[in-house]
Amino acid sequence: MPLQKNQLLTLRIERLSSDGSGVAHSPEGEAVFVPGTAPGDEAQVRIVKDCGRYAFGILDKLLTPSPDRIPVDCAVAGPCGGCSLRHMDYAAELRSKQESVADAFRRIGGLDVPVLDALPSPEVDRYRNKVQFPVGRDKNGAPCIGFYAGRTHRIVPCPDCKLQPGVLNDIGNALCSFFASHGIQPYDEESGKGLVRHIFLRRGAHSGQIMVCLVCTRPKFPHSEELVTALREQFSDIASVLINVNAKKTNVILGEETVSLYGPGYIEDTLCGVPVRLGPLSFYQVNTLAAERLYGIAAEYAQLEPSDVLLDLYCGMGTIGLSMADRCRELIGVEIVPEAIDSAKANAARMGDAVAAKSRFFCADAGQAAARLAAEGLRPDVIMLDPPRKGCDETTLSAVVQMSPRRVVYVSCNPSTAARDAAWLEEHGYHAEKVQPVDLFPRTRHCECVIALSKGEIDS
């Protein structure tokens, strides 16, 4: 019998789903997904939707809390939804992430590979170096920052997001006060009226430099000189103030035109010793300290020797490969985004003549470039793969096998596609030695992982 809407069930939460919801089973065996619950919770759950083989519910009453449950220290954690695991002890969160990665490699990849304990983030809160606040109005009609409630474009005001450094929250609130005092209107999606759509902020984890970028419907910003003066007086680490223009009716945050009100238009920072310049469009890991831990694992798994050639596919701004440039003879990077390749070349140049001389970066589709390089006879000793969430296509993986590197290191933001690709490589002569989950997104369900693969059989 299907579950009925508003039906109440007493359920025990067994595990977490991929989106962080608790998973339980009805007496008839139907899976029920319940946000805001933890494994071990006994709860009264209200059914909101039955989809046949599974259903969705909400927590109506917590009967017996899980030992892994902790008090939630954010008033809007529920409606905001940005911290889907804020109610769980961090050690339990890490265990859950390890189990999720292990399940993907076992169930999707069919691989019997050691999945190590998840490495924690050095910072559990205030770890993000980037924030994109939509700008709306609070219940009194005043401009406010916040985040969209799940599956809506309704802004939940959030003056102090626990994932952002305090100074970024302070800047967002100060800007809203400036908007209110100067009659600057937030953008309204329904009417298409208003000026300010988003507040986009970056902060260098090591440099402390801050970029302020206001996403607006037009380039001319009223009281711009006064705005810059007020920001610089209150926040001395601000290095750039920008206007990004997005006049389209779209969910895409940034537009194509950016105007500088103050500073060079970017901030500077370092990642594993690699100097980087970050503008509004730069793709960059949002948790710098945990990313350095991730790259350290990747370097360890690469086992580079001084005579080696390293091929870095999906290289982005070149940070992974450049962080290992002193360990190899030659570095070749491939990335499809032109701006990222320009940044990679500039980053290499800033590291000095020796690194610049041994580094080559190409703007191309990773799979097509890999196939071309393989056909040209390139035989790198180590290949680094860091694909988007969809993973690698078969063209890329086939080219990797054709180039026959001694080792392959696969960095992934999606354990499911990583497991699939690792299984393909196993079928074509590579051995998955181990998988290291690394937590770059505490308080959320997301987890990165690094896979070490070697050519042929290895001693157990």
Where are these regions (language model features)?
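Short, acidic/hydrophobic/Gly-rich beta-strand patch recurrent on exposed beta strands
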Residues: 22-27, 146-149, 213-215, 344
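Short, aliphatic-rich beta-strand segments
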Residues: 201, 207-217, 275-279, 382
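Extended interfacial segments that mediate partner engagement and assembly in macromolecular machines
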Residues: 60-72, 78-186, 206, 221
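Short, solvent-exposed loop/turn elements at beta->coil junctions and helix N-caps
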Residues: 117-124, 189-190, 198-202, 437-440
